[in-house]
Amino acid sequence: MKYNANTSNQFRAMFFKNATFLKRQKCSLGVQIAIPMALVIVLVILKLWIESQIENNSGPVGDSSGDDIMGSYISYKFDYMQGWFYTINPNNITNIGYKDGYGNGTGLLGGINQYEIYWNGSDLWVPYTVAVESGQKMNDMVLAQKQQLGQSSMGPLTFPIAGIQFNEFNPQNNLIDLTITCEQQIRYAYNNFENNLIYVLSQIQTSFINYLLNGNGVVVKTQISTLPYIYKSQQFDIASLLGGSFFPFALSFVLPLFMYSIVYEKQEKLRDLSLMMGLKMRNYWIMTFIFNFLTYVVIVSVISLICSAAKVSLFVKGSPFALFLLLFLWGLSMVSFAFFLSTFFKRTRAASIFGYFFVMVMVNLNSTLSLFNTSVPVFYYWVPILAFSRGISTLCGLCGNGLCPPLSQYTWDFELSRILFWLFIDTIVYLTLAVYLDKVLPREFGVPSHPLFFIKDLKELFSKKGKYRKLRDGDGINEKTKLINEYTIDGINNDDDDDGLMDEDVKKERDMIVKGEYNPEEMTLIVQGLRKQFPGRPKPALSNLYLSVKKGEVLGYLGPNGAGKTTSISILTGLYTPTSGTAHIAGLDIRYDMDKIHQVIGVVMQFDVLWEDLTCEETILYYTRLKGTPKSIEFESTHNILKEVNLLDVKDRFVKELSGGMKRRLSFAIAMTGESSIIFLDEPTTGLSIETRKDLWGTINELKKNRSIILTTHSMQEADILSDRIAIVSQGKLQCIGTQTHLKQKFGDGYSVRIDIQEDYQNTHNPTDLIKSFSPSATLSETFNGSYVYRLPKDSIISDLYEYLVLNKEQYHLQEWSLSQTSLEDVFLKISANDDTVN
């Protein structure tokens, strides 16, 4: 039963796999949640603490509801004030006078209202006056006092209350003109008043009136208060003001983690295996995008709830829709930008280090530029994290000062509107670049596409594909002539290879396929003139390959490295497209039906490609869902597959806890998902112990009962034991094909006989004459300590040789002998002797 792997099935498979895998990544998940939460919690704590300090240190205020109107009374009382005034008389005006610390005085200043204090062991009348020559002299004296005080934490307060410069004094005209110099630094002011000016004016007014009234004891006292007011809470919000630095970090730290997840699947070849098993590349990008964005949404939602509960202005004032757009578009552009950056990395470590470094540098760069509050060039908006950081910082600054912009303010002239636009553009541009660069940049596994691949795809879409589709009669191979027609349509010349140089069996295989001389119902795989030419390489990686595999057959597909094995399998599994030619798998054409073909093939890669933090059951469930197994039977199908490879008892065990043999069987189980018709085994037992290897051989023999298998291996023993037929490729061409016995007889050098002489006769007897008398063309190939090895031609009759040795055993003192045919390894080495990659 074949299943339909539609988009919804693949979305479901990827979502559950990603969610389960992320849940198991406790460290990664902790970082994703802890860093943003920690930053926001610190921000909220700072907000609450600073607000409490402001509350505790504020003066009388009105009702916060704003319904009551009241007056606030603030009185400056000058009792027990001690200090002095500097007086400056640059015009030598008469009758200015003075007032000393003993209560004596003359002229205008003699009318200052004093009081007595006890100071340094004696009585002192204050305030008193000290005359100085000029304002500059006064300033020098004050600065010297401040410098001296700055070097000592304690000491007597010797600062003047103020400096008074008399510009004009004319009692006859009731005129006085003066300049008052007051202390403005809180550090040097007295603790019982805030404004020296009020006190100085009171004293001057008292002196002036007493002077005019001839000293009648007038005292002027001044009090100040505010007008009535309606109370409003402070307009600034410290959390929003500080949020300009906190929020960009909190909402950007997931970017490196998104990069990590994509690079990890490339590095471990997990994505490649998923593609071979039927995952559509567009579905991979879409689902990865959605999953990463949902992860971001969860983090943003939690942050928003915390900040809303703490009444951070950014989240409770202004336009909720505008804030939603900013956060929403940042999420989209961040995921796209993470995709874009991930295309340049092959290792997770490098991607993570760069990601975190990039985030910190960009956020700090924006914070530095924001201090100058200058406009930025357009290219600034092409980096999403800079655009978002500037947008959120600007919004935080406005809301922090009680100026949250309403939605009506978001016009094109408002920078935040332009930032929203650029984040949308960044999303589209970087997502497009990510998909494009992923196809064309050099990669560790596979060959990149041509930079202009999309032109070829468009050309084929409107030309060849349409023409070909009109000639097709169905999805299966139901007529022998169908292949002949397709062979002609593609323009494949069956004389591409020189018939005189082509092996007879290879030519026979080709003619059988071209002429349709086979039963389509018995065939799982038909390869027709498959060719692959990579750009920039002088020779094709694969040249005019014809091959067939029957149902239930194991084909040993052998060849040296670089011979074309991997290229041909990559084409058959959909990783590459052929330059010319085609192939049919279960009646489906690899050029046009690859989505359906992925549902009927399984792949076991050379090394185990597994998610270490998934269980056996979760691993198989992912691929079962990927291939479209109905939801109602997906668990039943998973358990049946695990049972078939003897892993059902450990279905809940994590992959990282499995032995090497168990992991290999799990890889076989992956290939069996979705009722696979054909399985590609790439070096299935590499690196395993002999016991584990033999156990897996038994598993492979069980698998082939219902499926066809293509086996690639460098173990000739493995190929000899498991294969029904052997195909050897070299220099991109099929060199020979047939059963093991047939190939050994055809390409082997005959037989090898080993004879051991009894120990007492090793120096006196030599069996060479005996072997030569049986076969004159026999040759001695090896001798050592009474042991002789001879090569016999392949037309030798083994039964006659055995009888001949028995008859002459006593005469030649033969102790024992053994016979062996030419090995498959000998055939392989002979076939590949002229391969450039070997030599």
UniProtKB/Swiss-Prot annotation:
Bilayer-spanning residue ranges: 30-50, 238-258, 286-306, 321-341, 352-372, 378-398, 419-439
GO biological process: lipid transport; sorocarp development; sorocarp morphogenesis
Signal peptide: none
Main location: membrane
Domain ABC transporter: 525-756
Subcellular localization: Membrane
One Pfam family from the record: ABC2_membrane_3
Binding residue positions for ATP: G559, P560, N561, G562, A563, G564, K565, T566
GO cellular component, one term: intracellular membrane-bounded organelle
Entries under PROSITE patterns matching the protein: ABC_TRANSPORTER_1, ABC_TRANSPORTER_2
Gene3D superfamilies linked to this entry: P-loop containing nucleotide triphosphate hydrolases
Topology of this chain in the membrane: Multi-pass membrane protein
InterPro entries on file: AAA+_ATPase (IPR003593), ABC2_TM (IPR013525), ABC_transporter-like_ATP-bd (IPR003439), ABC_transporter-like_CS (IPR017871), ABCA (IPR026082), P-loop_NTPase (IPR027417), R2_ABCA1-4-like (IPR056264)
Keyword terms: ATP-binding, Membrane, Nucleotide-binding, Transmembrane, Transmembrane helix, Transport
SUPFAM superfamilies linked to this entry: P-loop containing nucleoside triphosphate hydrolases
Gene Ontology MF annotations: ABC-type transporter activity; ATP binding; ATP hydrolysis activity; ATPase-coupled transmembrane transporter activity; lipid transporter activity
Family membership noted in the UniProt record: Belongs to the ABC transporter superfamily. ABCA family.
PANTHER family assigned: ABC TRANSPORTER A FAMILY MEMBER 7-RELATED, ATP-BINDING CASSETTE TRANSPORTER SUBFAMILY A ABCA
Name of this protein: ABC transporter A family member 7
Naturally occurring in which organism (per UniProt): Dictyostelium discoideum
